[in-house]
Amino acid sequence: LSQLEAASDLPDAAWMAGMMRLKQEAFAQARGHLQSALAAGDRLGALFAKYDLSPQSTLPIAKGIFAHISPTERGTRLALVELCEARGDAEGAAQHLERLMVIAPEDPIVLLSFVQIALDTPHDHDLLDRVIALTAATQNDTPIDTGILLYRARALAARGLPDAAIDVLTRAGRRRKDRPDRLFHQIRHDRAELYARVGRKAQARREFEKLYAEAPEFDGLAERLGLR
């Protein structure tokens, strides 16, 4: 790491140093390195390409879903979104995501990151409507799709459409293969909460009990079931 930082005038070295500092949660240093790499434009990744290297780093996106990123504008901005989110910088995260939606509008990882951050402000109706529109065509073919559907359901619920949200969560929960347990448990919890919201108390109770059988440590669940 020290050698990379000593050579951080090279965009690829700055990128590697930034990713390593991000994993160490040294956010100020990580941000400096990653912004330097991003500012290099087309020079980012050139040294790796010269020596036929394809470095990747793993980045958490949402609910147990991870992305593999490389030294490109997309990868660097996704890393900066994660960094901004960790620092509570919602405005910074939003700026990077808006750019990502321009350069990679069809990228499901970008969409998942966007909708997750958008749902941090559930009272912004225009933003919620944008989430609903952007996710309208999402199927349930991959774990990333399933994550997107979770946030689509949350947007629908926040707009006062709980039954539509329940339908989305039911579809999202039908495929469990390759889905992180954390994601599946959150889907079940959100659906149970919505059942309770629309007065389907027995169904809500059944969902909460099923969730407890699988994940008794789920935050607040034991209290919800009256077990504590």
Locate the predicted segments by residue.
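Alpha-helical repeat scaffolds
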Residues: L1-L4, Q29-A37, E91-R99, H125-Q139, ...
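Generic helix N-cap/helix-start motif at coil->alpha-helix transitions
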Residues: S8-A14, E25, Q29, I69-L78, ...
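Terminal, low-structured helical/coil segments at or just beyond the last alpha-helical repeat
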Residues: R205-R206, K210-R228
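Structural motif corresponding to the intra-repeat A-B loop/turn of tetratricopeptide repeats
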Residues: Q24, R87, T121-H125, R159, ...
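Acidic, Ser/Thr- and Gly/Pro-rich intrinsically disordered linkers and low-complexity segments
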Residues: G45-H68
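Alpha-helical adaptor scaffolds
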Residues: L112-H189
